[in-house]
């Protein structure tokens, strides 16, 4: 699905992609909010979580576990969303169900450490967008 390009109001790429996809689906320009992953979705009427290049799955403070496997298990046991959208750099949105998104994370995610300013905990971070990633999304 092609995402509408709108005037950028956020310097954060992820917030901009979320706003653009929400506009594409609803016709509304919405303010980005920090919705807890286990309570609601980025685009609630579609039960959809929106991600983009280099995203963090969830902050270390709210995603429990000390290993990649523990964090994946915790996230997918508690996540509210049932649809996951990856907005590519060319503004194509790739939609995934929960099982496909988990495979995506297992393929392109890695355990990383938050900055000391944010507590220094472990988090899952997705790699920056690559041709291999786009090919995977097209085949999924």
Whereabouts are the PLM-identified features?
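Nucleic-acid endonuclease domains
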Residues: 1-140
